[in-house]
Amino acid sequence: TVKVTVTGAAGQIGYALLFR
């Protein structure tokens, strides 16, 4: 669903920022 896609995108962004 769209919700899963949005959550996945947010997770990827958060992960990237966390290990920036």
From Swiss-Prot:
UniProt-recorded Gene Ontology molecular function terms = L-malate dehydrogenase (NAD+) activity
User: Per the UniProt entry, what is one GO biological process?
Assistant: tricarboxylic acid cycle
The protein's annotated catalytic reaction(s) are: (S)-malate + NAD(+) = oxaloacetate + NADH + H(+)
The reply to whether Lipid metabolism figures as a keyword in the UniProt entry is: no
EC number(s) of the enzyme?
A: 1.1.1.37
Query: Carries keyword RNA-binding?
Result: no
Q: Which UniProt keywords apply?
A: NAD, Oxidoreductase, Tricarboxylic acid cycle
Binding-site residues for NAD(+), renumbered to this chain: G8, A9, A10, G11, Q12, I13, G14
Q: Which family does it belong to?
A: Belongs to the LDH/MDH superfamily. MDH type 2 family.
The protein's role, per its UniProt record:
Catalyzes the reversible oxidation of malate to oxaloacetate.
Q: What is this protein called?
A: Malate dehydrogenase
